[in-house]
């Protein structure tokens, strides 16, 4: 504990699980000296940021426009990206406590790395995990309190529908990584390295998207500002939380991040948002990867919606060719081809998702989240507008808390009674 001011006496109370339990106090230390800890890495990061800030203000090179120092901007971006990738590898490696060969020869896995793989290999969408008869007999199997009271064995965070287990989580990482790996090797791909792989792809393409944005919209931005913007963008990315805790939940997040980053890069370089000739093949790749992100994590459909709006806004330009006057028929043909490149990949993958939903839950629009076996009974969840304003406040307006310990400030933590917090 940390005490301040005048402290005369204090009492320590231990609460044990059972009445006959005991605890042994071996020693009590008061006023122990706080150890002096010096982190070279932390000081190095602070020093680099200070030097960067000084250089932005005073350096002639860093004040030059990006388009005049293309090589410097690319080299600096490569260094920043390499450092970020090294940081991701370090975080994953620090949590790795077994030989690499043993890790990549796993005979077991989790809901995504093993259960979905086994189900797909068996030609079914339901999981092969056996269901406890007690769960089948329950009036409301989604009531966590009732399951606990009846001592019913239920697979945590699995979807339970019509007497079978399913998985809510996206199938894209299963189809693109885990299933092929198991078919080729007979082993299950490790979760932590799957998260790392997708995280590295996302980090690299996030930088490439940023550079493509600079070339098209911020050519006169000073080099120092451009470099600082890249650092802020990579540092504020949520991928750091993902690679620091590589559970199966993070597979969907990391793979979705990678697909969105790749899709954003091709969307930016297709020139539908900027001047120049529109590249339909790149638009097709953007459509494919953004749709694939939805098959990683359904909530990422918001990026597809945004992409559709951008594609439609660029439709008038799609029928034109720079410096060439085309006939009306050719313009319409080019617009139709443009729409096909943008729509077909997205519609095909949307069809896969809709079929997968119907095969599991008898409705193409039902993703199954309400059938999850977790703490909350999602089948009886309600929407309250007041929670929207609470979320807006906590994410946009809440003032951070400051402390005397590193990193010296934290986000506000708001508790919403049972099982809810920001």
Where on the chain are the PLM-derived regions?
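Membrane-lumen/periplasm interface segments of specific transmembrane helices
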Residues: 90-93, 97, 317, 337-422
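Transmembrane-helix signature of polytopic, membrane-embedded enzymes
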Residues: 206-238, 258, 275-282, 323
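Perimembrane helix-loop-helix junctions
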Residues: 303-347
């Amino acid at each position: 504990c940390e005490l301040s001011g005048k402290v005369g006496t204090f009492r320590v109370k231990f609460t044990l699980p059972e009445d006959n339990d005991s605890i042994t106090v071996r020693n009590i230390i008061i006023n122990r000296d706080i150890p002096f800890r010096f982190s070279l890495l932390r000081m190095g990061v602070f020093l680099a940021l200070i030097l960067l800030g000084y250089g932005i203000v005073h350096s002639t090179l860093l004040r030059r426009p990006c388009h005049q120092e293309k090589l410097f901007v690319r080299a600096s971006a490569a260094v920043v990206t390499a450092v970020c990738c090294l940081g991701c590898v370090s975080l994953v490696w620090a949590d790795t406590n077994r030989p690499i060969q043993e890790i990549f020869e796993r005979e077991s896995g989790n809901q995504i790395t093993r259960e979905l793989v086994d189900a797909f290999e068996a030609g079914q969408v339901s999981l092969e995990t056996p269901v406890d008869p007690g769960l089948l007999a329950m009036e409301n199997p989604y009531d966590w309190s009732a399951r606990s009271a009846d001592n019913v064995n239920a697979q945590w965070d699995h979807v339970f529908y019509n007497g079978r287990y399913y998985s809510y989580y996206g199938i894209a990482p299963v189809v693109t990584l885990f299933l092929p790996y198991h078919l080729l090797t007979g082993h299950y791909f490790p979760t932590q390295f799957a998260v790392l792989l997708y995280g590295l792809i996302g980090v690299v393409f996030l930088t490439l998207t940023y550079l493509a944005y600079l070339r098209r919209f911020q050519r006169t931005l000073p080099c120092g500002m451009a470099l600082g913007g890249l650092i802020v963008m990579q540092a504020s990315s949520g991928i750091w939380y993902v690679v620091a805790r590589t559970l199966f939940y993070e597979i969907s997040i990391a793979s979705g991040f990678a697909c969105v980053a790749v899709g954003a890069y091709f969307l930016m370089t297709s020139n539908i948002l900027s001047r120049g000739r529109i590249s339909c093949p790149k638009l097709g790749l953007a459509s494919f990867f953004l749709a694939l992100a939805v098959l990683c994590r359904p909530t990422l459909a918001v990026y597809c919606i945004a992409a559709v709006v951008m594609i439609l806004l660029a439709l008038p330009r799609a029928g034109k060719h720079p410096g060439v006057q085309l006939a009306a028929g050719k313009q319409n043909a080019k617009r139709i081809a443009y729409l096909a490149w943008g729509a077909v990949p997205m519609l095909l993958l949307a069809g896969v998702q809709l079929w997968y939903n119907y095969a599991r839950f008898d409705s193409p629009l039902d993703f199954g989240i309400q059938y999850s076996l977790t703490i909350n009974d999602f089948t009886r969840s309600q929407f309250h507008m007041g929670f929207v304003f609470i979320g807006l406040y906590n994410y946009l307006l809440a003032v951070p808390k400051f402390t005397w310990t590193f990193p010296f400030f934290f986000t506000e933590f708001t508790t919403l009674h049972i099982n809810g917090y920001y």
